[in-house]
């Protein structure tokens, strides 16, 4: 769970993971989306590696996104339009983060290409203008539609849905990790009482109520004795 400041409270994030049950048509769309985000990641990872090896520079996310928009208009890659466009953009953002980390620590090597066998099938998408909803046991996703969901925990009504990561296990089970944002109120304590302390040479201190500490007078007695000597 993460926090950040906003107004008088703290904005916190909380994720819920639910099992989802897509129908056969939705399973096909999920498989297409998993494949497309993996292809996008690998295509521009190769592009970034080649440019880095040529002149030690990086291909920015903005450039990659523009190139992808152009690619989607071609006959060869028009299938990219069949899946959630935000999921493809998120794949490029994840790649950009991975490559930025490589720039900070080049000795770690380039990010690895994603493999269907080695990597878990998943994709992430963002909630924009209410395009994702969770209601009455169904999760509505862009390009996918209403997916049946087993909601074993209730979500407070004031929580705001931010993003969803859909994943498939090797055994074929589907899950949705849903990230919510909410404002956590900070309890302000009212000042009940104020006490001032006045330090002096005659006593250790005197508070604003006129009280003095009842410490033994060893120091003062020794001071008087030294003065007599």
Language model segments and positions:
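Nucleic-acid substrate recognition interfaces
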Residues: 1-229
